[in-house]
């Protein structure tokens, strides 16, 4: 595989890239954060103060639930669950170790930091990753 990739680089002058689309869930955020986030999308991805390629494309909201005094799940109307969709490109030979900055992007990864010029969420969970779409 490495030889084939090297031949592609030599023949074309660049590495082939694979588009990666992933979704990050952020729970328990104040409801106004949703509208404010939408104002700044799409927004380029950042890590350690530098652009890393790719962008946060969109955000969707869902209810956020908490336990009440009786142990029942109820909707917290002051907070929401947010689902951010981001895209990036990674060298095709490295698709199995997709990284954005220094962070690996894998389904189930917790404590993910989603950051752009205007948006930052810590403690997110990567809930979906699609390669090549």
Model-assigned labels for residue ranges:
Residues 1-133:
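Beta-strand/loop-dominated core regions that host nucleotide or nucleotide-derived cofactor-binding catalytic loops
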